[in-house]
Curated annotation (Swiss-Prot):
One of its GO terms (molecular function) is ATP binding. Produces ATP from ADP in the presence of a proton gradient across the membrane. The V-type beta chain is a regulatory subunit. Keywords: ATP synthesis, Hydrogen ion transport, Ion transport, Transport. GO terms for biological process: proton motive force-driven plasma membrane ATP synthesis. Gene3D superfamilies: 3.40.50.12240. The lineage of its organism: Bacteria, Bacillati, Bacillota, Bacilli, Lactobacillales. This is V-type ATP synthase beta chain. It comes from Streptococcus pneumoniae serotype 4 (strain ATCC BAA-334 / TIGR4). It comes from the Bacteria. Belongs to the ATPase alpha/beta chains family. InterPro entries: ATP-synt_VA_C, ATPase_a/bsu_AS, ATPase_F1/V1/A1_a/bsu_N, ATPase_F1/V1/A1_a/bsu_nucl-bd, P-loop_NTPase, V-ATPase_su_B/beta. NCBIfam families: PRK04196.1. The keyword ATP-binding does not apply.
Length: 461
């Protein structure tokens, strides 16, 4: 039986960090309990060890800590999450404690929140379609099981509504396999938290969801643990309970701000924009926990959502996220201001695995050709619109005017489906054909004749 030593040698507190002296047999990432003079228990984690000193990161903040009267205990293990299949349908705080008024979980086991490194050889290739019910994603930027596909948003854009829509509607097509949503919120307001919980409750989606809520008034340092706790729950459900799990994490910008706060408190040499130089490595320890494993039925699919500071896609957070993940969904202020919901800008958006989750047997044989044709037609339509601004509409040819008509209807009917319309992939593909029929058949050069004969509507639009 291991003996837990108690220390009263805290020597310094700087922001979210505490220095404990005269320690021995302490390890990196070890869980720490700090008992305050009033009996309150706070938790932390060992960040660094030098000789007989340990630097502890405090999850609940350092306010009210009396160094002389505080008792520090090192648990002998890393921060762990109590997991059970009964987590599904429950709401937890950012540290994994129930906050929905329900009973405490009876844990099946305790898992290290940092997870286990996945051997690349044991990974299975993502190739199965996930239907979100959103045409701009399902058809043009297809999401597949095991993928990590981030949403790049901006200040004031409705990324929360988009996240809630995906959480409500996402499903595995033509399958009776278990599907679950793990939702991790970091630094959101009380109103936003209420919005998410109410949206999932009123549609019944809460029954297949696990929510972890770190609010804006919770300690910023807790945000470093929240996504790891959520991913630990997702891995448990996926690889031990054979469920297909979609993990939605919002807002990753708040997570990175918490990392910067800890880095500044440690007096580390800052990197780009003041973020720590290891930001890329740290983000990869989250994003790379998505995937499928050979011999396992379950999968973990990630949709991280981040707000780009000043709408700058070259900012370190979206920039590094783009390097690690497999594409991006970009929200547009221009589309939002025109009243389109969700305001997904499909031209710069990308899913690098979209060709792996589409086609006969997965969606439909005309998926990829119509996707390519819609992209080409919309891009041409936007060019023609710019030309009309410079030269006037009178300078446009008859075909150019059809492209303008196509673009207008594409934005109004295809992109602008609303946050509460759930379109299955059949309806999305059929709508795509209806819009393409606006253009002359001679312009549809990316679709083979046999598909044109089969699907192109015969009536004039």
């Amino acid at each position: 039986m291991s003996v837990i030593k108690e220390y009263r040698t805290a020597s310094e507190v700087v922001g979210p960090l505490m220095i404990v002296e005269q320690v021995n047999n302490v390890s990196y990432n070890e869980l720490v309990e700090i008992q305050l003079h009033n009996g309150e228990i706070r938790r932390g984690q060992v960040l660094e060890i030098h000789e007989d000193k340990a630097m502890v990161q405090l999850f609940e903040g350092s306010s009210g800590i009396n160094l002389e009267k505080s008792k520090i205990r090192f648990a002998g293990h890393a921060l762990e999450l109590a997991v059970s299949e009964d987590m599904v349908g429950r709401i937890f705080n950012g540290m994994g404690k129930p906050i929905d008024g329900g009973p405490d979980l009876i844990p099946e086991k305790y898992l290290d929140i940092d997870g286990q490194a996945i051997n690349p050889v044991s990974r299975d290739y993502p190739d199965e379609f996930i239907q979100t019910g959103i045409s701009s994603i399902d058809h043009l930027n297809t999401l597949v099981r095991g993928q990590k596909l981030p949403v790049f948003s901006g200040s004031g854009l409705p990324h929360n509504e988009l996240a809630a829509q995906i959480a409500r509607q996402a499903t595995v097509l033509n399958s009776d396999e278990n599907f679950a949503v793990v939702f991790a919120a970091m630094g959101i307001t009380f109103e936003e938290a209420e919005f998410f919980m109410e949206e999932l409750r009123k549609t019944g989606a809460i029954d297949r969801s696990v929510l972890f809520m770190n609010l804006a008034n919770d300690p910023a340092i807790e945000r470093i643990a929240t996504p790891r706790i959520a991913l630990t729950a997702a891995e448990y459900l996926a690889f031990e309970k054979d469920m297909h799990v979609l993990v939605i994490m919002t807002d990753m910008t708040n997570y990175c701000e918490a990392l910067r706060e800890v880095s500044a408190a440690r007096r580390e040499v800052p990197g780009r924009r003041g973020y720590p130089g290891y930001l890329y490595t740290n983000l990869s320890t989250l994003y790379e926990r998505a995937g499928r494993l050979v011999g396992k039925k379950g999968s973990v699919t990630q949709i991280p959502i981040l707000t780009m500071p000043e709408d700058d896609i070259t900012h370190p957070i979206p920039d590094l996220t783009g390097y690690i993940t497999e594409g991006q969904i970009i929200l547009s202020h221009e589309l939002y201001n025109q009243g389109y919901r969700p305001p997904i800008n499909v031209l710069p958006s990308l899913s690098r695995l979209k060709d792996k989750g589409s086609g006969e047997g997965k969606t439909r044989g005309d998926h990829a050709p119509t996707m390519n044709q819609l992209f080409a037609a919309y891009a041409q339509g936007k060019k023609v619109e710019e030309l009309a601004v410079v030269l006037g509409e009178s300078a446009l040819s008859d075909v150019d005017k059809l492209y303008v008509r196509f673009t207008k209807r594409f934005e109004e009917e295809y992109i602008n489906q609303g946050f509460y319309k759930n379109r299955n992939i059949e309806d999305t593909l059929n709508l795509g054909w209806e819009l393409l029929s606006i253009l002359p058949r001679t312009e549809l050069k990316r679709i083979k004749d046999d598909l044109l004969d089969k699907y192109l509507p015969l009536v004039e639009v």
